C-alpha cells in the first residue's frame, strides 16, 4: 500500500501565517520538499498537487528531483501552458479575471464579505452543477480570519503583482519558473473546468515531454478529485504503479 500525507498549504488555517509573508511558488515548492524530509520520504515518493498545489509540486520536483519518483498535477498545467494562455488566449484571460482583481486591496473586503460568498461564486463557475456545500464550508474555514484570507490572496499577489518575494529564494524562483520537472508527469484536467479551459490543457499536451501524459476527465470541472474521485484515483494509482520500477 501507500502512505499518504495531505498537508494544508502555507497560510491556510490551521497552519500559521509565515513570518516573512512569502507565498511565491518557490516557497511553496520548498515547503513540499521540507515535508518530504520531515516525513522521512525516500526517492520512491510521489508528489501530487491540485490548483495551487500543482505549481508547488512542479517546483518541488524541479528543485530537488532526487526526492520524487513521479509527479501528478491537476487543474493547473505545466510546461509553460499557463504563461502562453495569458499572452495568447483572451478567453483564459477572461476566466482568470479574479487573479487580477486580487491585486487590489479592495479584494480583501469583497472576498471576506457575506460569509465569503465570493468563494461560492467561484465554485459555481469552476465546477458547474456540482453540489459541494460541505467542501465549500471546509474551504471557507481555512480562510475565515482576515489574516488567513490575506495570506491566500498573497499567493496571487506574489505571482502576478507586487506581493513580497523572498530574496533568498531568487535562484529557486528562477528555476521553478524556467524549468520543467524531469520526472514522469501525469497531468489531469476536468472537461468542464470553468477556471482554466480545456484548450489550455490541450496546449499543455502539445508541449509535454515523452515521459508525460495528459488526461481530460469527463464529467468533471475544476475540482475533479471531488467530482469524479473513482476516475481520478484510478488514473493516479495506475500511473504510480506503471512508473514504480
Language model feature labels by segment:
Residues 1-2:
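A short, Lys/Arg-enriched amphipathic alpha-helix followed by its capping loop at the start of a domain
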Residues 5, 12-48, 52-212, 216, ...:
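Flexible "cap/lid" subdomain of the alpha/beta-hydrolase fold that forms the substrate-access gate
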Residues 211-245:
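Catalytic active-site module of serine/aspartate enzymes centered on a nucleophile-bearing elbow/loop
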